[in-house]
Amino acid sequence: MGNHMNKHIAALTVACLAATSANAAGLPERVKSAGKVVVANQPNYPPMEYVDPATNELKGVDIDLGVALAKELGTTVEWSNISFEQMISSLQTGRVDLIHSGMSDLPKRRDTLDFIDYMKSGAQFYTSFARKDEFKTLTDFCGKTVGMSRRTSFPDETAKWSAANCEAKGLPAIKVVGTEGSADARAQLKQGRLDAAVQGSETLPYLMDLEKDTYAVVGEPFTVVYQGIGFAKKDTELRDAYAAALKGLMESGEYKAIFAKYGLEGTLLDGIHINGEAVK
C-alpha cells in the first residue's frame, strides 16, 4: 500500500516537474488570491530557523529557502510561529498552508502529510568539551544519561540504538531523558545533569562555532533521515508547485548557495524526493 501510494505520488509529481515554469500559475486559487503562503515555523532550531537577537529578524536555512521558493512561485511568505506539537493540526484546519520548520520526514507522519524532502539529517551524540576524552566510541554512552528533545523522534531512535548496540551486547542501556527542547538538553549538559545529548547533526557545527570549546561531537550520526516541507495530503496542487520550485532552485544553483551559507553543503539532496523516494 505504502509503495503503491508513493509511486502514485511520484507519477503525479513527475507531471508537474516536466512543466518547470514554477510560477503562480501552478498555485492553488486560494494562494493566488491571498498573494501569500502561510507557513508554520517555530524559530528555535538554529541554524535551520532562529530569531537574530541583534535585529529580531527570522534567519536560517529554512527561512532563506522558504523565501526563495515563494519568490520562484511568484508569491510571498507569511511565517506563522506555531509550536511544533500544533503544526499538523494547524495544517489540517487550514490555519497554515504548509509546514517548513526542520521537520523530519518520518513514515508515521506520512499518514497525514506529504513531504517534499530538501536535506539529509541524522541523530548525533555529543557531550561537553570537558568530557570529550571519556567518549571515544558510541558504545561509551551505554549506561550513561543522555538527553534530547521529547518532541522529536530522537528518544525512540536512541532507545532503539541502545537496544541493538548496548543491551544486545550485555552492556547497560542508555538512560534516555526527554527534555523540553534541544536548548534545555544543552543547559542540563552544562549543569552536569546529563552525560551527553542527542541533536540533529545539521545543528551542531553552528552551535560549536557559536559556543567554542563547549561541546564535542562523538562519532557519526547514528540515523539517516530527510527533513521535509509538509503538506496536507489533499493539497497536491500546492505540493507539486513547490516540488517544481525546488527543482528550479536546484538547477539555478540557489539551493546549493543557501546551504553553503550555513556550512551545510554535506546535507544536500541530489534531485527531488517525495516522502523519502527520489522522483525521476
Q: Where are the model-predicted features located?
A:
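Short helices/loops that flank or line small-molecule/ion binding pockets
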Residues: 68-72, 80-81, 85-98, 112-113, ...
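Ligand-binding cleft/hinge of the Venus flytrap
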Residues: 67-73, 154-178, 208-212
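A ligand-binding cleft/hinge motif common to bilobed small-molecule-binding domains
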Residues: 85-86, 103-110, 156-162, 190-224
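Periplasmic-binding protein-like
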Residues: 43, 120-127, 209-246, 265-280
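A structural signal for short loop-to-beta-strand junctions that line the ligand-binding cleft
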Residues: 28, 58-62, 109-120, 216-219, ...
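Flexible hinge/capping segments at coil-to-helix
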Residues: 128-146
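Beta->alpha turn/N-cap motifs
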Residues: 41-45, 80-85, 94-106, 121, ...
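Extracytoplasmic small-molecule ligand-binding "clamshell" domains
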Residues: 25-102, 252, 261
